[in-house]
Amino acid sequence: MKLFEPGRIGRMLIKNRLVMAPMHVGGLIEPDGRLLQRCIDYYTARARGGVGLIISTPHSIRGEIKSYKMWMTGLSELSDAVHDYGVKVAVQLSAGQGRNVSTDYLRSVGAVGPSTLPCYFNPDLMTRELRIEEIQRLVQSFQFAAEVVSSAGIDAIELNCHYGYLADEFLTELWNKRTDRYGGDLEGRLRFPLEIIQAIKRGAGAEFPLSFRFGLTHYLEGGRSTEEGLLIARKVEAAGVHAIHVDAGCYETEYWGIPTVYLKPGCLVGLSEMVKKVVNIPVITVGKLGNPELAERVILEGKADFIALGRTLLADPEWPHKAKEGKFEDIRPCIGCENCLGRMRESKYISCAVNPMTGMEREFTVRQAKRARSILVVGGGPGGMEAARIAALRGHKVTLWEKGDALGGNLIPASVPEFKQEYRSLIKYLSVQIEKLGVNIELAKEATVEQIQAMNPDVVFIATGSMPIIPDLPGIEKGNVVAAIDLLLGKREAGQSVIVIGGGLVGCETALYLTQKGKKLTVVETLNDILRDTFRINRTHLQELLADAGIQVFTSTKVLEITDDGIIIADKYSEKKIKADTVVLAVGSKSDKNLSETLNGQIPHVYEVGDCLEPGKVINAIWDGFRKARLV
């Protein structure tokens, strides 16, 4: 595969075309930029997995050279650890977040920008415009930081100039309203990034490999156009950068910068292809490229020189080795749930819903058990399959009973819409792994207490999942009412006009799915907003898709009754009737505790796993199965 041929960025020879994209690591790094041992372990795992170049978490530039000298020890240890695997490492340097700082940071420290701008998370608060002498000190600080980075054995630097952060704000007319030499036309707006590039070269050396990360377009009215983006690409090439790392978006359109499940794989490749046509230096592309065949095709067709993988490598650090060996079925897929981001926004360390070891590589090592036991797992959903996988890895003799005719549990209906194809990949991955590990899988087998007692296992994991909640409403028994799960599984068909009761993720994705099948949709939610429990980026994108599809959404609205031809609803002002052929229920789920309650006290060493314990997300089920099986 061409994906595994060497490539160059400036003088730096990289063993393949795979780059670990820069991602914030949350609690794995100190606020002053020092790397914790867990951070080094995290990057080492990706180096061991076979990536060619690792680009670090962004390091914010502030203060004098003594501030950056504190980075030296951690960066030196990182470079040594990564180099042991023949992998190169770059440090991304950032001028800061500008108007995109968190509200807490904004209130305690404040925010600066090229101009006075409303802050993204709290538009009532404004950034302070940087003075020219502050800009010049900031530029000088990049030189200091580059000196430290290059002295620590790091192989390259990447300049963060994307996503609407401070350097990108200077570059963008929408946010840069200055009238001095750092504003105005493109030449003025480029001055700050170009001065940073020269400062990095003074600090690290003119030939020290330097990548420029920027968004070719913001996909935002008034933001950067692709035409201007191509001009910028040519100008930074002329300034001496050695590679251009192309993405898109900003906080207003962040589902482009961190592509959601609703965008197609390789959604940003067309942008890198445009840049390739106007520059003569390597171009790095990024964005939902976790399919090895797609990544290979991008390189073969000359649409980019390098493939950057971000969340893909959180899900499976061994992706490069598995792809090179053609073991595609062994690649654990990113499902695009964005819990990795959600947890960091809660001030936690970087993590992954489908890979509990991410960020805890040393602490969560799976070791052989001291004594092999017989283990029964009841339920073949994500929690049950993960428990079976880990138990088998530890050397236990594992049997899994699933009452249905296929593995997957609630992932099966969740994976029906085309935009949830990653969930199908997760089912396949888990199924293949437990089969390869020798788990005895019995389908169409509903467990009873008597059967479990007859088997007499040492340990039982109950992973029977959850079932839909059926609300107590007048008319709930009518023939036009169907649970979302039954509709997705094809047990029932929807009419041409459909009302979905419930504006959570299941309800809204079901509505989008039905709209794509040509149905007319209405969503009714009792809370004051839909998708309350969905992380911001997926939520924002899905809300826009629902609006674009013409789906009518009622919030702060109760359903009073289901009729033969629709429902009667009420808000605080009035009641009204909405007509529809079909009423879909998506008001949540409840744990299926029938077996666990029956087993209570009759069999020792019984553990509930996943939704059986408490309904939750994929992350809850998989992490629960992982942690409990790891301790048995």
PLM-predicted stretches and their roles:
Residues 28-29, 64, 167, 220, ...:
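Glycine/Thr-rich phosphate-binding loops of Rossmann-like dinucleotide-binding domains
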Residues 289, 381-383, 406, 504-506, ...:
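Residue-level detector of alpha-helix initiation sites
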Residues 377-393, 495-521:
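Rossmann-like NAD(P)H-binding beta-loop-alpha module
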